[in-house]
Amino acid sequence: MKVRPSVKPICEKCKVIKRKGRVMVICENPKHKQKQG
């Protein structure tokens, strides 16, 4: 899980979602997981 000021999809399978008011990226590739901090 990467914590970044700006999250963006890395590949086609990355999805940008909102959880508890936080923007997150979920993907099949665990390296692509990000959340906004």
Curated annotation (Swiss-Prot):
Organism field: Thermoanaerobacter pseudethanolicus (strain ATCC 33223 / 39E)
NCBIfam families in the record: rpmJ_bact (TIGR01022)
Originating gene: rpmJ
Recorded superkingdom: Bacteria
GO biological process, one term: translation
Keyword Ubl conjugation on entry: no
Keyword Ribonucleoprotein: yes
Protein name (database record): Large ribosomal subunit protein bL36
InterPro entries: Ribosomal_bL36 (IPR000473), Ribosomal_bL36_sp (IPR035977)
Family of the protein in this entry: Belongs to the bacterial ribosomal protein bL36 family.
Record GO terms (molecular function): structural constituent of ribosome
GO cellular component: cytoplasm; ribonucleoprotein complex; ribosome
Keywords: Ribonucleoprotein, Ribosomal protein
